[in-house]
Amino acid sequence: MGNNQSIIERLVSWDESISFEAKRVSGKMVRKALETIVAFANTKGGILVLGMEDYSKAKGTDRLIGIQENAEAVDELQQKIQHKIIPPIPIDDVLWKKLNCILHDGNSGEIVIISVPMSPKVHSIVEDGTWKRLEKGNREMTAAEINELCFSRGVISAESELVDVPFELLNTDSWRSYCENRGINSGDIKDRMFRIGLARKKDNLILPTKAAVLCFAEDPSGILSSKDSVRVFHYAGTRIEHGAVPNLLKKPKTISGPLIKQITNAYEYVINEIAKGLTIATSGFETVHRYPTRVIREAITNAVIHRDYHITRDVHIRIFDNRIEVESPGLFPGNITTETIAYAGSFSRNPLIVNCLREFPEPPNIDAGEGVRMMFAAMQAQGLYPPFYSSRRDSVVIFLLNEERPPVWEQVSEWINRNGFITNGQLCRIATVDTLKASKMLRKWVELEMLEVDMSKGKKNARYRKAGSEADGNVIGLLSGLSDNKKSPLL
């Protein structure tokens, strides 16, 4: 009961947000709750509490109305979750938990917590549309928004689109090397690509897929009138300086060609740039780049292979004195997030491209879903910080830091993963340091863009969370308290 009380105290203090909503089980609750559940699944996940008044109408324990107000509505919602959502949200993915509590009138009662994960799919309600979550409330999505979300989640991929490109433009050295390695000898290029799924019929014509153009054309960007190359920027110092004289060490390098060559050439170019010996950092100290080469290769490979080719933008690699950044167009596919990337299973946005590149004589470093884990292990073995991922509006950036990792970081990282944020006082207790030392540590992590600070509650109450984090810190902490008590929807 003590743990329940702690959870309830947190719940009643929360206002509605992109990841949280509370509802009384009366009136039109079932329809609105179903919309919220679908909206959470289609956005970032979230928590819906039944039997609790809205924050704008009551405060504290006065919000605890209880589900006995309309218990039948809760049963109806359970049924509709299973039968009115398409495609269905797996029943085991939705966590339901009843909590006993003292209601606003002093009587004993129950509320229900429903935890909905971010889904790898895009869900709709039968005869009630497709919904997304806003900062407060839900909104029905337009057809264009649904299409964009399908591309973003990897439900559909631009690689499978048919393009009106002559097959002779794909009959390159890369194509011949690929065919020789696979033992594909019979038929012309059109027939061969059709047989292996890299071309399909449309109106009695056989056309190549975008994947075929990306994998074999000498200049995919030119042929597709798109931006499907890799660009490398090498900066002096630790940040981009905007001004009359940019702090680029040299002209940006554009690397184009078939994807297999983009990966190889970009990797070799970056390795050559960081292997030129010592560089003078802006601090005046000499620095040596210590990144494991396997990690750099994997970061580039992932950016090229798993990017969203629906977005017209190149992959950007930025080299600084203290880090390498690789920015890949498109968000994480499926339900992978910055919080789960280190241990999430593989989810390929572009299976045609992945399968194609595996069949080259010297395939890129595709480790059957283990590449990200390898990166974390290799950076740890080198004594460096683990890779950091940040989600931006329509891209994902991986940061490889050329910085020695202090032992306390593992505890700090785990604390933030469980609670969503950390404060100066909490770091003092974890690291057994004074306030000044904790402030210096936090300030450095912010400068390295590993953490970002929230001062909305004042400087003394500053909270730090991982940069580019996609989850609501409040929800993270609550979910960690519920995860050991998971119950099915059939309460």
Language model regions located:
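Conserved N-terminal catalytic/coupling substructures associated with nucleotide/phosphate chemistry
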Residues: 1-292, 300-404, 417, 423-428, ...
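Extended alpha-helical interface modules used as scaffolds for assembling large macromolecular complexes
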Residues: 441, 450, 471-491
